[in-house]
Amino acid sequence: EKKQENIAMIIGEINNNNIERLKEYGINSLFLCSIGTTNVYSPDSYRDTILKIIKQTNPEIILFSGTSLGKDLAPRIAANKEYSIATDCTSISVKSEELEVKRPIYAGKIIETVILKINNPIVISLKINSFDINKQSQNEPNITKVENEIKENHTNQVPILKEIIFPEKKTLDVSEASIIVSGGRGMKDPKNFNII
């Protein structure tokens, strides 16, 4: 197991109670990030803020919670930086220069083990309620305040569905048919379906 510095980020409205609680969990550095109007979630502004911190800190592993925001931001960061990503992880183990993660697939019927090389930063999103948080000796993290403004071209990037254009179909889709006629091998030939 590798012992590394733990860095945390809080984006949006800053709650002093949250800062005090983080002191009990071994956080070495804490970035408090405010982005313009904090009660509005802007994916691009949040992404740019996280990328700014990544550039400053050069992390090996970037963890996101399994919340809706975490699931939205994790792939944005990975795609922007071309980092490896593993989602919905229930187990993480660092061994030498490899990261081993486990995650459920096929609606939880199978547990997949993924081995990732730590030659580039890795983005991980955690499955909710899969990890215990152990309190450690309280320490005073190095706190840095970061201010980012929402860029003008980031404020109105909500997609709006205006029209659905369906392709022309020569045959009716089975799911749209009002009557379905089925026959087995006993029909012998497609032309015999008119008997049914």
Predicted feature residues:
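N-terminal glycine-rich FAD/FM-binding segment characteristic of electron-transfer flavoproteins
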Residues: 1-196
